[in-house]
């Protein structure tokens, strides 16, 4: 799960199982069951309004971001060449010009390069991203959410992840550290949280997220599957 409901809950009654076999939100007050968090009966709908897969979400996100829904021929979505320019332009194949950033990235280091530039220019003061548990040299496959506040921390989070990480869970840490201009790097389910929040009048939570980078994704894996795969292949 994207954890949009977790960071939006004003009553702190939604937790998140970020362990093998989990990766889903849950009610901390589990004795009340899945349909009653104790506050929902009183009219709180923050979690459902923050959920980017609840109700019709794509038109809502498009309306917030571009003031219109996309046309039938806009298969790749709505994109534009400038902030005020709604004219279609080419989709670009890019890579980082900094050799170190390029080498540390998975497919050219573009995301890392954008984050570094945005941070050095003062556009953002932190990024919600992911790291490998125990560090890049630990041999771990498990991805965990974290906050990057400088070039080294951004590069430490570069490269691919083969297990799920709800990067939005790093939001509370960022806010506690006093960061107020954030970038969010996440898969499509996570990157669709901020515009949906604004469209559904729960934008206060997503207000610090000024820069939203969505990564192409067809699926992701629970790290518990690797033990099964290795056992099946190598015995």
Tell what function each PLM region has.
Residues 21-36, 92-101:
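Glycine-/proline-rich flexible loop or hinge segments
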Residues 4-26, 40-69:
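Iron-sulfur cluster-binding cysteine motifs and their immediate structural context
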Residues 56-235:
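Iron-sulfur-associated redox domains of electron-transfer enzymes in respiratory
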Residues 28-50, 83, 104:
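Short Fe-S-cluster ligation motifs
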Residues 10, 28-35, 110-117:
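Short alpha-helical segments and helix-capping/turn motifs at coil-helix boundaries
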């Amino acid at each position: 799960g994207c954890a949009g409901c977790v960071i939006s809950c004003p009553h702190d009654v939604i937790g998140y199982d970020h362990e093998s076999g989990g990766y889903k939100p849950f009610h901390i007050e589990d004795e009340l069951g899945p349909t009653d968090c104790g506050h929902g009966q009183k009219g709180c709908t923050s979690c459902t309004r923050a959920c980017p897969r609840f109700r019709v979400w794509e038109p809502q996100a498009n309306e917030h971001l571009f003031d219109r829904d996309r046309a039938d021929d806009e298969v790749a979505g709505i994109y534009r060449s400038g902030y005020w320019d709604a004219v279609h332009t080419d989709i670009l194949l890019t890579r980082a010009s900094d050799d170190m950033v390029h080498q540390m990235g998975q497919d050219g280091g573009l995301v890392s390069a954008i984050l570094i530039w945005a941070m050095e220019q003062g556009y953002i003061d932190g990024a919600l991203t992911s790291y490998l548990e125990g560090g890049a040299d630990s041999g771990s496959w498990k991805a965990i959410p974290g906050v990057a506040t400088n070039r080294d921390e951004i590069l430490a989070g570069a490269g691919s992840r083969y297990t799920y990480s709800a990067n939005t869970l790093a939001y509370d840490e960022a806010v506690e550290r006093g960061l107020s201009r954030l970038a969010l790097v996440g898969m499509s389910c996570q990157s669709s949280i901020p515009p949906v929040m604004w469209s559904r009048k729960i934008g206060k939570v997503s207000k610090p997220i000024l820069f939203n980078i969505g990564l192409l994704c067809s699926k992701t894996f629970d790290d518990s599957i690797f033990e099964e795969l290795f056992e099946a292949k190598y015995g």
